[in-house]
């Protein structure tokens, strides 16, 4: 089995241990020095290009907040926040 050197993204310490898995099955790690929990493969879906436009388009087409969040694989609060901010910017 191959060994991979993992460093904490906050303090760059090599004193890291496995700290379980996230709901998608990706490994989580914890730093022994700063106690930060992090993942190596984390993607923030709401930051991808075009997500804000899709949220507003789905809202205009009558999709609910929960349906939009489930379809786009983002949080319900992200959908609500995006709709509020888009309405204020008009």
UniProtKB/Swiss-Prot annotation:
Keywords on record: DNA recombination, Transposable element, Transposition
A Pfam family: HTH_Tnp_IS1
InterPro entries (alphabetical): InsA_HTH_dom, InsA_N_dom_Znf, IS1_transposase_InsA
Plastid is among the record's keywords: no
Biological processes annotated in GO: DNA transposition
Function, as annotated: Absolutely required for transposition of IS1.
Family the UniProt entry places it in: Belongs to the IS1 elements InsA family.
Protein name: Insertion element iso-IS1N protein InsA
